[in-house]
């Protein structure tokens, strides 16, 4: 709790711009789009959670690609130095430059890379069930729709122009393709060696690149281990 004397001290206050999104008062669509505009933050939180609990090399590589993509966006913005639309009506933004949109570039990188992963990386077996294929198609469409809606939200909320989100999407898509190829051709062959490092073993870092369907593999292994332990427990109780 602040002391009484501290309340009168002059100070320059700054917001945390990472999660600060403004929308027109009373605009329901703008309110919803403002929350949707926070999707990159939700994605990052999801990645950190996955890495903490799964510790899988490909997930770490994916997050590294997103970080590199953000670095490229920052570099392009500071080289082009194109201002945001309408004279910058928002006071709390990370940078005054808007070309290209970092939100658009982030979401299109995430969506395009996930799309390639679903159809090229996971499509290693020819006996995929109908529901698996349907889930893959629905998820891909959902990812692409999310990328478009986030891009649209940045224009609607006057953070960017259409050209800024368009070029951001193009940059993110190209970066996703390049990083996917780099991961598949350069990093993936190194994953078994990296997973065998002492530091990787200490932190339980694992490589699942040779397993076509990790979800099904984890389900079957967990079920088999649970049944095995249940049988052993039943034997001890007899």
UniProtKB/Swiss-Prot annotation:
SMART domains: acidPPc (SM00014). Its EC number is 3.6.1.43. Keywords: Endoplasmic reticulum, Hydrolase, Membrane, Transmembrane, Transmembrane helix. Pfam families: PAP2. It catalyses: a di-trans,poly-cis-dolichyl diphosphate + H2O = a di-trans,poly-cis-dolichyl phosphate + phosphate + H(+). CDD domains: PAP2_dolichyldiphosphatase. It is found in: Endoplasmic reticulum membrane. It is a multi-pass membrane protein. Pathway: Protein modification; protein glycosylation. Its main location: endoplasmic reticulum. It is an enzyme of class 3 (hydrolase). One of its GO terms (molecular function) is dolichyldiphosphatase activity. One of its GO terms (biological process) is protein N-linked glycosylation. GO terms for cellular component: endoplasmic reticulum membrane. It comes from the Eukaryota. SUPFAM superfamilies: Acid phosphatase/Vanadium-dependent haloperoxidase. The chain crosses the membrane at residues 33-53, 100-120, 130-150, 162-182. Required for efficient N-glycosylation. Necessary for maintaining optimal levels of dolichol-linked oligosaccharides. Hydrolyzes dolichyl pyrophosphate at a very high rate and dolichyl monophosphate at a much lower rate. Does not act on phosphatidate. PANTHER family: DOLICHYLDIPHOSPHATASE 1 (PTHR11247:SF1), PALMITOYL-PROTEIN THIOESTERASE/DOLICHYLDIPHOSPHATASE 1 (PTHR11247). Belongs to the dolichyldiphosphatase family. This is Dolichyldiphosphatase 1. It comes from Callithrix jacchus. The lineage of its organism: Eukaryota, Metazoa, Chordata, Craniata, Vertebrata. The gene is DOLPP1.
